[in-house]
Swiss-Prot record:
InterPro entries: SKI-int_prot_SKIP, SKI-int_prot_SKIP_SNW-dom. Involved in pre-mRNA splicing. Residues 36-51 have a biased composition (Low complexity). The lineage of its organism: Eukaryota, Fungi, Dikarya, Basidiomycota, Ustilaginomycotina. Belongs to the SNW family. This is Pre-mRNA-processing protein 45.
Length: 621
């Protein structure tokens, strides 16, 4: 097989000779890299070429590799390599190199497990292959007897030997750790040191005193109460940590310009000068440092300011246009409102003038008929819509279509005119009723009406003609504010006083005081009610009947009875009417409770009385 394989392989370029132990690892690596076939072929070549040693003078490219190359002789001087004939001069100690030789298994794969298997103790196992992870029961490369060989129960002797070996190892570790801690017997305090014998030979041998002597040295006795001589001292601080490395250029000489640039002026304060030094102005300005830096303004600031200015101007223009438009709309609305109010006022004045001239009186019937006749004579005669409708129906056969259309249009105009006249009559009627109510209005209602008229807007007053022009144009302030006191505390009262109501309720308002007081023009109450004149009393009651209750509602019951009986007028009361207080039980609850306590039963008479009372109550309701 080897011959057949060599027949296919090319001729070797170099002669492959076996390596010796003294060769370096590179040559061994090259040899093992070639694989088992190459090693076998090389061994064959060695076996054939080992006896053939080149003659002297032709050994420049030849190297002795094995002990057979020396032929039991010495080294070859012409071969400049390390030679160890008969292993003479070879270092037998362990190699100090940490390089490992590359090894190859039978299949040509490199064995990398040599890295972890180096420097192992005897009996130590390292698992470096994948098959080591497979359980032994599933391994196919192990025989059945080898598979169960490692699972036998150990014997008693093996267990005891392993236990004893483990105990001794643990004791050795423990003693090694405790040895520095446990002191010797002689080093314990209070114990006497053992005596030492020292052979002493003097240096001077003259005068016959050079004989050797043996000296017994013992420890001197120490006083147990003596204070300790050892003093604790502060240990000197160790050297500091080295400075960190700084990567910088080598130092060079500083120029005058650089010194000038690096010159920092002294601090000169603008507020303090405790020493009173006279500081030149240029030094003060140099210390200010305001002019050292050049102020660089970005162009975007100008653009931003310009944009803000344009936006502000545009916004102001929009606001101005909007305000102008609002003013125009407000003026137009105000003008329309004034025009509307002016038209209303004009219409009211015209209607009032028409009512006063053509409206009949309230009480006179003849004047009403006369005014209607005069109104009918003054207006042109026009047929009523019903008469015109009947006439148009009679003449329907004698008219054309155009005449009928004209008649229909005229009818619509007449109807519209009639509706307008009805509306005017209704407005005039309402106006007359309003005037009548105002004429019959009491003082209170009239005061409220006056206040309502005073609270009108000035534009409404101008439109209705009620506004009065100001007599003087100089008074532009409210004169009512000048008659006030200094403050609230000036005229109100002292803070310790309790008289909260220092003035009457309606002392300052004449309109409100008139509600509860009779006007002086109509006479006081004493003038009317103190006298015995019945005519004046009835007249006053008839005039001041505000609520429409009539005079009979104001008369006393006792006075009516006396008047009916003819006994005369009612007795004059000196004070207000006194009402009697009903102290009895109106619902008979107390009587009911007393009856219930006594246990009184209801009789038939009481039931009949209750039935009559219930019937009477239902009839009254």
């Amino acid at each position: 097989m080897s011959a057949t394989l060599q027949s296919f392989l090319p001729a070797p370029k170099y002669s492959a000779l076996p390596h010796s132990r003294d060769d370096d690892e590179n040559d061994e690596y090259d040899n093992t890299e070639a694989g088992p076939s190459t090693s076998s072929s090389s061994s064959a070549l060695v076996s054939t070429s080992s006896p053939s040693i080149p003659p002297y003078g032709q050994r420049a490219a030849w190297r002795p590799r094995t002990q057979a190359d020396y032929a039991n002789g010495g080294a070859y001087p012409e071969c400049h390599v390390a030679q160890y004939p008969l292993d003479m001069g070879r270092n037998r100690s362990a190699a100090t190199s940490n390089k490992l030789a590359m090894r190859i298994d039978g299949e040509g794969n490199k064995r990398y497990d040599a890295i972890v298997k180096q420097s192992l103790r005897p009996g130590q196992t390292v698992q470096t292959e994948f098959k080591d992870l497979v359980p032994l029961s599933q391994r196919t490369d192990i025989k059945e007897k080898d598979r169960n060989s490692g699972f036998e129960r150990p014997s008693h002797e093996e267990v005891m030997s392993n236990t004893e070996r483990t105990r001794l190892a643990l004791e050795a570790i423990t003693k090694g750790k405790n040895k520095p801690v446990v002191p010797k017997a002689g080093n314990l305090p209070g114990q006497q040191q053992a005596a030492q014998f020292i052979r002493y030979t003097p240096a001077q041998q003259g005068a016959g005193n050079g004989t050797q002597r043996i000296i017994k040295m013992t420890e001197a006795q120490r006083d147990p109460l003596e204070p300790p001589r050892h003093r604790f001292k502060k240990t000197a601080a160790g050297p500091p940590s080295p400075p960190p490395p700084v990567l910088r250029s080598p130092p060079r000489k500083v120029t005058a310009q650089e010194q000038k640039d690096w010159m920092i002026p002294p601090a000169v304060s603008n507020w303090k000068n405790n020493k009173g030094y006279t500081i030149p102005l240029d030094k003060r300005l140099a210390a200010d440092a305001s002019g050292i830096q050049d102020v660089v303004i970005n162009d975007n600031f100008a653009q931003f300011a310009e944009a803000l200015h344009l936006a502000d101007r545009h916004a102001r223009e929009e606001v101005r246009q909007r305000s102008i438009m609002q003013q125009k709309l407000a003026a137009k609305e105000k003008a329309a409102k004034e025009e509307h109010l002016r038209n209303l006022a004009q219409r009211a004045r015209e209607e009032r003038a028409g009512v006063s001239s053509a409206t009949p009186s309230v009480l006179g019937r003849d004047d009403d008929v006369a005014s209607r006749l005069a109104d009918s004579d003054a207006r042109p005669t026009r047929a009523t819509p019903r008469a015109e409708g009947g006439m148009s129906a009679m003449l329907a056969g004698y008219r054309s279509d155009s005449d009928s259309d004209e008649s229909a249009a005229s009818d619509e105009e007449d109807d519209e005119g009639a509706r307008e006249r009805d509306r005017i009559r209704e407005e005039r009627r309402r106006e007359r009723q309003r005037e009548l109510r105002m004429s019959n209005m009491g003082i209170e209602q009239r005061t409220k009406q006056l206040l309502r008229e005073q609270n009108r807007d000035i534009s409404e007053k101008v439109a209705l003609g009620l506004a009065k022009p100001t007599a003087s144009k100089e008074s532009m302030t409210d004169s009512r504010l000048f008659n006030q006191g200094e403050s609230l505390a000036a005229g109100y009262g002292d803070e310790d006083s309790y008289n909260l109501y220092d003035k009457p309720l309606f002392s300052g308002s004449s309109a409100a005081a008139a509600i509860y007081r009779r006007p002086a023009a109509r006479g006081g109450a004493n003038d009317i009610y103190s006298g015995a004149d019945d005519t004046a009393l009835e007249e006053e009651l008839g005039k001041n009947d505000r609520f429409g209750l009539g005079q009979s509602k104001f008369r006393g019951v006792q006075g009516d009875a006396d008047r009916d009986s003819g006994s005369g007028s009612a007795p004059v009361r000196s004070g207000p009417v006194q009402f009697e207080k009903d102290t009895s039980d109106p619902f008979a609850i107390n009587q009911f409770l007393e009856d219930a306590k006594r246990g009184i039963k209801r009789t038939s008479d009481q039931d009949a009385d209750d039935a009559r009372k219930k019937l009477r109550d239902e009839h009254d309701s």
